Amino acid sequence: RVLRVGWCAVLGNTPETQWPVFGSSGLPETPPEHLDFLPLSGPVALDPEADWVPDAWQQLDTKLAAAPLGAIGKVVLVGRPGGPDFRPSEVARLGYLAGIVATVLVR
């Protein structure tokens, strides 16, 4: 395994993006009202208590990380309900994996 997550969403890399462009089966039904963490320029562990994070996600203690999908204008957002926090090595792996996926998508 590269990293353990409960769900994944693909978004546009702008704050005005629709929620989500694509999402996994475990994606929470409660969408964020706004996406203040966008745009992203690199992989990052996100603050799970930020204003944009829905209360339902916070109640589940969902840890969040995201990475841009190369230069295709998309971002992958992953959630881990119940934690633990994403380690820096996991965030780096997410960025590396997102780069590979972006390379495949543009071909």
Regions found by a protein language model. Give the residues of each.
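Signal-transmission linkers at sensory-effector interfaces
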Residues: 105-107
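Amphipathic alpha-helical "output/dimerization" segments
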Residues: 86-103
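A generic structural motif
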Residues: 81-85
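GAF sensory domains
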Residues: 1-2, 6-79
